[in-house]
Amino acid sequence: KIKSVHKVVEKKPDVIRSPYRDKNYIIYIICVFLYAFTFFQLFTTQPVYFKRELNLAETSIGILMALNGLVITAFEMVIVHSIDGKRNTLQLISLGSVLLGLSYLIFNLFPGGFILALISTLICVVGEIFSLPFMNSHAMSRTNAHNRGQYAGLFTMAWAVAQVLGPAAGSQIAYNFGFATMWWIMGGTFLIAAIGFSYL
């Protein structure tokens, strides 16, 4: 009898790569931090700006903030599903960052009250839809089963630190130098993040 010999091929384990040695991921995390740093102005300094500088009533401010959530709820999944896998995620994140930057800079470019705030909010919503859903998925696309926790931890840390520093920095800039300066800085920071995302 001829015995067949089956050679057992062992699957090689995934290479365990540290996120701290992943140069492109570090650049990505820096861009995510810049994005989040400016993004949190939406919930802190922007409502104050609406009330003090645009003289909006609290009811109007509440309507604008609710509109943001309603539009995202209604359209985000449809839009994301239609473009997911068909476009480079980094380019989409970059586009979203540009739109968010414009939603801030518009305050320094045009006079206005509620209409200006409404236009800014709608631009902001589109920017969020094109960027936020893809950020975490892009980060996780660089991982394997062995280092996913490390990559996720660094990503979460970027958002957590930005949530602490962003609102504090924004309010201090607005208090000491005025809202116009604050919008130039925050809008410009969004554009810097957009350039970083597109570079990757």
Give a label for each model feature.
Residues Q91-I106:
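Structural signature of the two symmetry-related core transmembrane helices
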Residues T44-L64:
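Short amphipathic helix-loop junctions that connect adjacent transmembrane helices
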Residues Q172-F190:
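A membrane-interface helix-boundary motif in multi-pass transporters
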Residues N108-S120:
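Helix-loop junctions at membrane interfaces in 12-TM secondary transporters
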Residues I2-C31:
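Juxtamembrane intracellular "pre-TM" segments in multi-pass secondary transporters
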Residues F75-N88, A174:
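Helix-to-loop junctions at the C-terminal end of transmembrane segments
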Residues R21-L42, L122:
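Pair of pore-lining "gating" transmembrane helices in MFS-fold secondary transporters
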Residues F130-T143:
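Intracellular juxtamembrane helix-capping segments at the cytosolic ends
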